[in-house]
């Protein structure tokens, strides 16, 4: 079965994924940050026991932090199956769909976080997946809900719908033209946040950024998605425009950049994470812009590589501890093994 990020999607030249995350708490428990270890264990066990027998969750893969090592947790976080916050929790559990498009986290910043992904720009699909799962879970758990304030959440900014919607965007042209710092305050005027998925906002790792809503209280799910879509479409148009300008004015330079990136990755024997992500970003740009072609391989496959070269994945493949140099050698081997032939 293909995982969600192995599929193509709308506007996939710029939009890697659509994600909806719902924050929910359960009556009878303190918020997660106030819970004792005893109560945290009780929450994890009780919720897990209640959810594991119901459809469709009974067909999901389950996990419990009692039985995972640090590398396994890190690998799940690298694939966005769990959040950085959950990774640091001592007591946590959850369920993941076989294709990893739906994930249920227990004892995150809120008692339950439901997240759903769709490839490319398809927020409605992600929302439908999350909403259906929310209904299933809400049938067996007593959510904390107030008629005036909506779903009660640990952070007041999440109250109301409890929904955060976000797009993961590949923005090499905007980043390369130093336009990200100007976009951040602009999207902020519309209640949105634009930030690097990893690294510095001015130069994100792999040129990958997240656009997400900041305000949920007083907004319907449709309001949130419509506002996000409107701004995302403007950013997509700007990114495409800068790509077109670059290729029109400096096509040989663009081709040279893409082929150099390919050549380095094809023959390098050591690759750092930063270099690997940068060079793969440039190849993704080349594929998405039509500068190069690879049979049976497109920009979505490049994103698989961008996930695959993170440390935990390499450590799990090797099944042994590695120092930094050994990781760089393993990363170069992994890239050479999966890099397609281009023309």
Kindly label every feature range from the protein language model:
Residues 1-148, 163, 175-177, 182-184, ...:
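Long, Pro/Ser/Thr-rich low-complexity/intrinsically disordered regulatory tracts in eukaryotic proteins
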Residues 150-168:
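Conserved phosphate/anionic-ligand binding catalytic regions in large, soluble enzymes, centered on
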């Amino acid at each position: 079965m293909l995982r969600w990020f192995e599929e193509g999607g709308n506007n996939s030249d710029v939009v890697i994924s659509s994600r909806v995350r719902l924050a929910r708490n359960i009556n009878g428990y303190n918020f997660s940050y106030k819970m004792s270890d005893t109560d945290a264990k009780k929450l994890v066990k009780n919720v897990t026991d209640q959810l594991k027998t119901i459809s469709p969750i009974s067909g999901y893969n389950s996990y419990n932090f009692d039985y995972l090592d640090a590398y396994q947790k890190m690998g799940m976080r690298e694939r966005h199956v769990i959040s950085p916050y959950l990774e640091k929790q001592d007591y946590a559990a959850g369920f993941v769909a076989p294709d990893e498009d739906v994930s249920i986290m227990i004892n995150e910043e809120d008692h339950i976080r439901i997240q759903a992904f769709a490839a490319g720009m398809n927020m409605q699909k992600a929302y439908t997946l999350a909403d259906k799962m929310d209904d299933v879970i809400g049938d067996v758990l007593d959510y904390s809900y107030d008629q005036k304030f909506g779903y009660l959440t640990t952070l007041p900014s999440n109250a109301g719908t409890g929904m955060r919607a976000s797009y993961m965007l590949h923005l090499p042209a905007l980043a390369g033209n130093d336009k990200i710092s100007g976009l951040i305050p602009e999207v902020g005027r519309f209640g949105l946040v634009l930030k690097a998925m990893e690294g510095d906002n001015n130069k994100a790792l792999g040129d990958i950024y997240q656009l997400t809503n900041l305000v949920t209280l007083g907004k319907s799910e449709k309001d949130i998605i419509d506002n996000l879509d409107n701004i995302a479409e403007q950013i997509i148009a700007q990114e495409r425009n800068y790509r077109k300008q670059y290729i029109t004015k400096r096509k040989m330079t663009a081709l040279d950049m893409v082929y150099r990136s390919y050549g380095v990755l094809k023959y390098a024997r050591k690759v750092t994470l930063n270099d690997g992500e940068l060079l793969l970003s440039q190849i993704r740009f080349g594929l998405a812009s039509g500068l190069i072609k690879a049979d049976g391989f497109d920009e979505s496959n490049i994103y698989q590589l961008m996930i695959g070269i993170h440390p935990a994945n390499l450590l799990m493949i090797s099944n042994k501890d590695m120092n930094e140099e050994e990781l760089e050698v393993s990363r170069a081997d992994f890239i050479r093994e999966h890099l397609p032939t281009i023309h």
